[in-house]
From Swiss-Prot:
This is Insulin-like growth factor 2. GO terms for molecular function: growth factor activity; hormone activity; insulin-like growth factor receptor binding; integrin binding; protein serine/threonine kinase activator activity. Residues 92-179 form a propeptide. The lineage of its organism: Eukaryota, Metazoa, Chordata, Craniata, Vertebrata. Disulfide bonds join C33-C71, C45-C84, C70-C75. The keyword Manganese does not apply. The insulin-like growth factors possess growth-promoting activity. Major fetal growth hormone in mammals. Plays a key role in regulating fetoplacental development. IGF2 is influenced by placental lactogen. Also involved in tissue differentiation. In adults, involved in glucose metabolism in adipose tissue, skeletal muscle and liver. Acts as a ligand for integrin which is required for IGF2 signaling. Positively regulates myogenic transcription factor MYOD1 function by facilitating the recruitment of transcriptional coactivators, thereby controlling muscle terminal differentiation. Preptin undergoes glucose-mediated co-secretion with insulin, and acts as a physiological amplifier of glucose-mediated insulin secretion. Exhibits osteogenic properties by increasing osteoblast mitogenic activity through phosphoactivation of MAPK1 and MAPK3. The IGF2 locus is imprinted. Paternal inherited gene is expressed, while the maternal inherited gene is imprinted, hence silenced. Residues 53-64 are annotated as: C. It comes from Bos taurus (Bovine).
Length: 179
């Protein structure tokens, strides 16, 4: 009793399907840095906002911030969601509570950790701090401009030619025609 070719192909296809599923489940996730990290956190967390480091209740001594975890190591959805802020109480929850605040207490916004303006500022801060190659590009541009200026100064003409045409401004030719 031998194994037929059809059965061996079927077993091979089943093995390949299983192997591809396992590879997809355990492959390393992508890394996220800078603006991509902030955009992804904004998408994942939505209106809740997010933290760059975990809230103090979850901190242990060896914990790293999201930049260290997602930029230098692989990052997945479950890890990103741990950095989302907890939503503030809804109006229904607040109205059901029995505590009443005095009128003279100044109201501070609660639960708005990284809304758009602050998120945009932190994105700009990240972009200012991270990419050194942009600073290098700007330095190269300035160096090229400086070199062009030096070239222009070193290649000055020996005789300074007038910028205006003497015939149109009544130079020597107009005196000769009037004589």
């Amino acid at each position: 009793m031998g194994i037929t070719a059809g059965k061996s192909v079927l077993v091979l296809l089943a093995f390949l399907a299983f192997a591809s599923c396992c590879y997809a489940a355990y492959r390393p996730s992508e890394t996220l840095c800078g603006g991509e990290l902030v955009d992804t956190l904004q998408f994942v967390c939505g209106d809740r906002g997010f933290y760059f480091s975990r809230p103090s209740s979850r901190i242990n001594r060896r914990s790293r911030g999201i930049v260290e975890e997602c930029c230098f190591r692989s990052c997945d959805l479950a890890l990103l969601e741990t950095y989302c802020a907890t939503p503030a109480k809804s109006e229904r929850d607040v109205s059901a509570s029995t505590t009443v605040l005095p009128d003279d207490v100044t109201a501070y916004p609660v639960g708005k950790f990284f809304q758009y303006d602050i998120w945009k500022q932190s994105t700009q801060r990240l972009r200012r701090g991270l990419p050194a190659f942009l600073r290098a590009r700007r330095g190269r541009t300035l160096a090229k401009e400086l070199e062009a200026l030096r070239e222009a100064k070193s290649h000055r003409p020996l005789i300074a030619l007038p910028t205006q045409d003497p015939a149109t401004h009544g130079g020597a030719s107009s005196k000769a025609s009037s004589d």
